[in-house]
Regions:
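P-loop NTPase nucleotide-binding/switch module
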Residues: 68-70, 77, 84, 97-146, ...
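Mid-sequence acidic-hydrophobic segments that form the walls
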Residues: 92, 96, 167
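Glycine-rich, histidine-containing beta strand-loop boundary motifs that form or position
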Residues: 20, 56, 93, 101, ...
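N-terminal accessory targeting/assembly segments
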Residues: 1-88, 93
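P-loop NTPase catalytic core
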Residues: 137-465
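Residues that form or immediately flank small-molecule/cofactor binding pockets and catalytic motifs
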Residues: 13, 49, 94, 116, ...
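A generic structural motif
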Residues: 13, 37-39, 49, 106, ...
């Protein structure tokens, strides 16, 4: 029979201290009853002799030192999982909020997951189609990869996340695909935008949503991504599905960690974040991957807003060390009404080279991507020179690069929020834009591929003659 403890020794924000505890374990879940009626859940985060520090998952406002009873469950935080979770919406601690009743779970799993043996991992291959040219063409998302989006306040990362959910699919017509979407610290209107968008597009049927609102307890934000990944791992590794996990906003997760760490009186590290921020982020990001001998995969797109657009801030900085590339959104492109405002040059996908090309996308994919990167870099040089000497004084080739740069931003990077481009459309568009430049400038493409795909753009005079 479980022992029930009456009263608390102190309350500090989301943390409460229980004394005289015996047999408690780190990360153990406790059930707390307030005034004999309201029930709350908490987690033991520290143990000193007979003292246990407990993080309460809900508000502690109505809790007092004498009106609370605490019972140790002897178990870690667990979630009931089932394939029926697809198409359902839950709050930040896994309780259903869509009015469709509780889930009949097939089993209970520890939300902390089990670390994947590096030897058991299979190297990620095959791409995930997003329908967005800047991603599919230049920073291709590979199954089993973790590819974050670095955004900033006011940039359209929510709209981009919704578009990815609407359009994401597996190449080759496979249908064993699902999405787990976790929103942390979002405002109600943003959460409502996601719900409406998924329902109107028809994507909701294969999406499991976890929503932690801005007015929900801060501590829930530390649980939400773990719940989402536990469900994703179950669907991927036990039901052989390919699962895309979108986590937004990881900055809210890190700030929640800072707040809880501060209330525990821990010594802060960079920018006030705890010294274990790196290991906590790694514990989430490293749950992506493919296990050898299992058909399923877990792919992650964590989204984070960089404070003051600072890519050296601890959150994007540490994220970059752990993940396999990044997609960076740019405020200048946003000001030019380019959507999605993906900054091509600092963006990359480290696993892209092994999941594209013949047998995956198209044989010219890598060459086209390399050449577009190279040409767009020269656009920056031409624009810098034009700002000094004036556009009229530029050489003819520099003027051609300016024309290419404008067309590239408006036509290749820019697209309608509901436009779903196939990989063939994306690559053909890339060749069309490269046709604005003379063949002699295309030095990153194999000669045989140039002969097959390159067609120079017609000048106005040539078009009139034809």
């Amino acid at each position: 029979m479980a022992i029930e403890y009456l009263g608390l020794s102190s309350i500090h924000g989301p943390l409460v201290v229980l004394e005289g505890v015996q047999g408690a374990a780190y990360d153990e879940i406790v059930e707390m009853t307030v005034d004999g009626k309201e029930k709350k859940l908490g987690k033991i985060v520290e143990i000193y002799n007979d003292k246990a520090i407990i993080q309460v998952f809900e508000s502690t406002e109505n809790m007092a030192l004498r009106n609370t009873r605490t019972r140790l469950t002897g178990r870690p935080m667990e979630v009931e999982v089932s394939v029926d979770m697809l198409g359902r919406t839950f709050n930040g601690i896994g309780q259903h909020i869509d009015g469709l009743g509780p889930i009949r779970g097939e089993k209970k799993l520890d939300v902390n997951g089990k670390p994947l043996n590096p030897v058991a991992r299979e190297y990620p291959r095959n791409y995930i189609h997003t329908g967005i040219s800047a991603i599919d063409g230049l920073t291709t998302l590979i199954r089993g990869q973790k590819l974050p989006i670095f955004s900033g306040n006011g940039l359209p990362h929510d709209q981009l996340a919704a578009q990815i959910v609407e359009q994401a699919s597996l190449g080759g017509g496979e249908d064993n695909f699902g999405i787990v979407f976790a929103a942390m610290g979002v405002k109600y209107d943003v959460a409502d935008f996601f719900r409406r968008t998924f329902e109107e597009s028809g994507a909701a049927d294969h999406v499991t949503m976890f929503v932690n609102l801005a007015n929900d307890p801060v501590i829930e934000r530390l649980i939400t991504p773990k719940l989402a990944l536990t469900v994703a791992e179950y669907l991927a590794f036990e039901k052989s599905m390919h699962i895309l996990v979108i986590l937004t906003d990881m900055t809210s997760f890190a700030e929640a960690m800072r707040e809880v760490s501060s209330s525990k009186g821990e010594i802060p590290s960079r920018k006030g974040y705890p010294g274990y921020l790196y290991s906590e982020l790694a514990a989430i990001y490293e749950r992506a991957g493919i296990v050898e001998g299992i058909d399923g995969s877990v792919t992650q797109i964590p989204i984070l807003t960089m404070p003051n657009d600072d890519i050296t801030h601890p959150i994007p900085d540490l994220t970059g060390y752990i993940t396999e590339g990044q997609i960076v959104l740019d405020r200048t492109l946003q000001g030019q009404s380019v959507y999605p405002p993906v900054s091509v040059l600092p963006s990359l996908s480290r696993l892209m080279k092994d999941g594209i090309g013949e047998g995956y996308t198209r044989k010219d994919h890598q060459d086209v991507a390399n050449q577009l990167f190279s040409c767009y870099a020269k656009v920056g040089d031409a624009r810098a020179l034009a700002s000094v000497i004036g556009e009229d004084e530029l050489s003819p080739i520099d003027k051609q690069y300016l024309i290419f740069g404008k067309a590239f931003e408006e036509q290749f990077i820019g697209q309608d929020p509901h436009e779903n481009r196939s990989i063939t459309d994306t690559l053909n568009l890339g060749w069309k834009l490269l046709g604005l430049l003379p063949r002699t400038e295309l030095d990153r493409i194999d000669t045989k591929i140039l002969d097959e795909y390159y067609h120079p753009a017609q000048t106005e005079g040539e078009a009139d003659e034809s």
